[in-house]
Amino acid sequence: MSLRFVIGRAGSGKSTLCLHEVQEELKQRPRGETILYLVPEQMTFQTQQALIGSEDVRGSIRAQVFSFSRLAWKVLQEVGGASRLHIDEAGVHMLLRKIVESRKDGLSVFQKAAEQNGFFEHLGSMIAEFKRYNVTPSNVYEMWQQLDAHSSSAEQKLLANKVYDLQLLYDDFERALIGKYLDSEDYLQLLVEKLPQSEYVKGAEIYIDGFHSFSPQELEIVRQLMICGARVTITLTIDEKTLAQPVNELDLFYETTLTYEKIKQVAREEKIEIEKTIPLMEQPRFHSPALAHLEAHYEARPNEKFNGEASVTIHTAANLRAEVEGVAREIRRLVAEENYRYRDVAVLLRNGESYYDVMRTLFTDYNIPHFIDEKRPMSHHPLVECIRSALEIISGNWRYDAVFRCVKTELLYPLDVRKETMREEMDEFENYCLAYGVQGKRWTSEDPWMYRRYRSLDDTNGMITDSEREMEEKINRLRDVVRTPVIRMQKRLKRAGTVMQMCEAVYLFLEELDVPKKLEALRIRAEESGDFLFATDHEQVWEEVMNLLDTFVEMLGEEKMSLSMFTDVMSTGLEALQFANIPPSLDQVLIANIDRSRLSNVKATFVIGVNEGVIPAAPMDEGMLSDEERDVLSAAGIELAPTTRQTLLEEQFVMYQMVTRATEKLYISCPLADEEGKTLLASSFIKKIKRMFPDVKDTFITNDVNDLSRSEQISFVATPEVTLSYVMQQLQTWKRYGFEGNLDFWWDVYNFYVTSDEWKQKSSRVLSSLFYRNRAQKLSTAVSRDLYGDKIKGSVSRMELFNRCAYAHFAQHGLSLRERDIFKLDAPDIGELFHAALKRIADRLLRENRTWADLSIKECEHLSTVVIEEIAPLLQRQILLSSNRHFYLKQKLQQIIFRTSIILREHAKSSGFVPVDLEVPFGMGGTGSLPPMEFSLPNGVKMEVVGRIDRVDKAEDENGTFLRIIDYKSSSKALDLTEVYYGLALQMLTYLDVVTSNAHTWMKKGHAASPAGVLYFHIHNPIVEVKGDASEAEIEKEILKKFKMKGLVLGDADVVRLMDNKLSTGSSDIISAGLKKDGSFSARSSIASEQEFNVLQKYVHHTFENIGKDITEGVIDIAPYKKGNKAACTFCNFKSVCQFDESLEDNQFRTLKDMKDSEAMEKIREEVGGE
């Protein structure tokens, strides 16, 4: 029994020496004593290849490469102890979830924390750490007793409570495993116990290579290996000079030196012979003087400079994508020009979550075979999502999001249906569920679902149309597709008495859905498209889910469990599932994490993402215990994993390992922005490399080829898939700025695409975008007639929409596009309710021959309650009755109508104007409807402007009859004459024109009427600020001011006083007008003369005629207006249709100039030739 160390700096040949010794031994004695070669898990594959990679050694039974866990399997198979079932990470998380749920009421700290994402991953890691560091539940309990006895501060009490929770959960976990199961850490403890019984290990020659440190548990394994084996050889990355000095935590080799001392101490304790250490002083790895210099002087202070041409390259990239593309181009160049194999190249990085998806996509585009040494979670696979969402449907009372997450896995679809058709039908079905707010018992009820198009509150027609009947049948058919398998599982789960029966319900759910056949179809499709990685995913996921169910049954099969706990435990297990890495092929680029990789002897290494806070890593407190808490435990004798501070000290060694992997070339790069455009800073580590290699230039990587030289641009000619976008970029530049003669090779590339049989069709579609203009072609007369007919009937809102954006009008009224209806209360619904409520109150007053002024406060409250109760069942499929939240909202809306009724009562008391009618239709046909506003357009098309007027008021005096329009709004609004001029605010003036033009036939007395004005009434329940001692009357007066109506009124003092009979001088509290002492109007009054009202009405007619002419002539320009901070696109539903983009030459806003009312009025006069 002896111990031998082989030490040396990185690249000194430690592993090579050991491998050569093993190979020589195998050549000389192929059947001798066992040779064990122990390496970290991630090194096993490459070490196995290296061991049998020589011509003399093509295979071996005598020598085997193991990791600690694989050696445990081997030994336990030999001597026994492996009869207990293995529990993987998913099983551990499930068991912990069950333990936490059962212990929840007794936990001090983790009761709420258990609901946070990642909690069980952290808890599992903490327990694994306890085991690796030989900390038992009793050790943790003793620690809690010490802490609890001496806790005085809040921090100390928190730690004591945390340790208490940990010991409870750890103890329960260990008790659950005893005699039944083994987790990954248990295998190592069993290995320690069983090694003395192993004949396989006894007398073996043992090599331990690639480790820098050992946990206490691993150190015990090393102890037993030294006792059982003939000789143990351990390699450590240490400079021999370090061993001659006192150990300093700032030393580059501090961690490995500590490991060296710990192992020697174990050898002394076991009286193991310690052979003379073999120090390796040369640098055989490095074929590059620059890389040899980097390794030899890495830790030197100040930095030793290397002058001359270096094989070290530094890149700064515009963004993360440009960085990865730069790496891909250089890898292809190395393979094409320097005879590299892909296996000669490695990419090292730390923040893989930011890079892996981009690298998979781009390396595939560049045809670079690659292997990412990182396990991927299964959580996004359709099968895992189907199980998780189906269980959430049942436990969460059929919520919309869970139902349609399950639907979109497409595993609920019948096996024999055409997926494309089913997807379209399910999209329609989802729209129905959103529009009708379907959830809860409606899914499980046997009552058929009804389908009716929601039209308005006034639509009381109960007849169902044929199209509605067809849609109803389709919806009920699709409902059964979705609910039948889930309800079947729901019933089985409710009947289940044990966990085994619950797992059986899940299994039957999957079998009845024909999931194995569906996954097989997905696998075949992936293989046919050449995506072999995803093909194997579909195989793996079924196997892993079945293993998970088996583990669940094995662990908890006979226990009883609530449905909610079962769902939580199952979801926890599903979250932990991971795809196994397929071993890399013989010729692939290896992409690996800096912290976990154990590469050796690759020719070129690319270290990417070298940004501040990433390399070196910023300190982060993660897991169950903070650094301070770990220090407290350490001081009390419980050794755990290194703290953040210790990890940061080790960062220098990690970075040293990172830059000493390559034999010929080292590339270091960082992006200046991430995928979202957020700024990133270069790491200080790059500055260090620049100081060591002052002649190395930091080159900038960009994907804009126009900024690069000819030779640099040529490197962008890679695969046809990738190069096509750069050809487009060049052609776009030449089109805009002209051709540069020295870049003619791009024409050769272009000619390849247009002449290649394979690429001609694909490239033509892309290249055609070069001449793309986002313009909507004018419709032909025939198409326009087909869309709009020979007679156009439209509302004022439709005409205003055309002036806001002609294309939006075309999308809504030509193509009849609509946003999907969602079961929610929007502003239009609230506005409709307000209108209907006030009309019902007004109609009741008219029937009773009363006015608003006759109402008492109590009657206002009563009537507002009555009408809201009448309307609520009719609004938006009874949305106000659908939930407690909406019921509360109904009460708030009733309060607003109550407040509005009070204000209308006050207005009526102060006004000579009385309502003539509400919701007055024009051009709608039927009794009581006024005629439409009619136009005969130059092209022969007839156009009618129709609508419904909120309220018409009338007043009479010796000068005649006056009419005014009141429009109810749920938000504050005023009449802007600039918007009238641009055709954006035509509604009120149109209404006024309709009622005054038809007064002689409409009014009962049959005589003409003059315009008195147009006013907006803001329906709301305002909050006012008053002094603390303000009386109720003062408060009511302030509230009344908040309801001042804005608009435009006739500039006649008598008419204004009819609107507010309390007004003598000053500003009115009711309308936006005021009088001076001399009887003239104040400057802030919104007034117009009768002649100006006539001009405005003429202008409205003129504008409508122009709009009608443009509509019928096929104008659909993508030309939205912009006026100040208002723009047509702000609330437009059709932005995704028109693709308006200001960066395109053709897409610019129609900027409308803001004007004073007087200036706008003058322009309006000019347009119609008014005086």
Swiss-Prot record:
Catalytic class of the enzyme: hydrolase
UniProt keyword list: 4Fe-4S, ATP-binding, DNA damage, DNA repair, DNA-binding, Exonuclease, Helicase, Hydrolase, Iron, Iron-sulfur, Metal-binding, Nuclease, Nucleotide-binding
InterPro entries: ADDB_N, DNA_helicase_suAddB, DNA_helicase_UvrD-like_C, P-loop_NTPase, PDDEXK-like_dom_sf, PDDEXK_AddAB-type
EC number of this enzyme: 3.1.-.-
One Gene Ontology molecular-function label: double-stranded DNA binding
Residues engaged in binding ATP: 8-15
Residues the entry annotates as binding [4Fe-4S] cluster: 805, 1129, 1132, 1138
Domain UvrD-like helicase C-terminal: residue ranges: 281-587
Cofactor(s) needed by this chain: Mg(2+); [4Fe-4S] cluster
Entry keyword annotation includes Signal: no
PROSITE patterns: UVRD_HELICASE_ATP_BIND, UVRD_HELICASE_CTER
Residues of the UvrD-like helicase ATP-binding domain: 1-343
Gene Ontology biological process terms from the UniProt entry: double-strand break repair via homologous recombination
Pfam family, one: UvrD_C
Free-text cofactor note: Binds 1 [4Fe-4S] cluster.
Family classification: Belongs to the helicase family. AddB/RexB type 1 subfamily.
Quaternary data: Heterodimer of AddA and AddB.
Protein task: The heterodimer acts as both an ATP-dependent DNA helicase and an ATP-dependent, dual-direction single-stranded exonuclease. Recognizes the chi site generating a DNA molecule suitable for the initiation of homologous recombination. The AddB subunit has 5' -> 3' nuclease activity but not helicase activity.
Miscellaneous field: Despite having conserved helicase domains, this subunit does not have helicase activity.
Protein name: ATP-dependent helicase/deoxyribonuclease subunit B
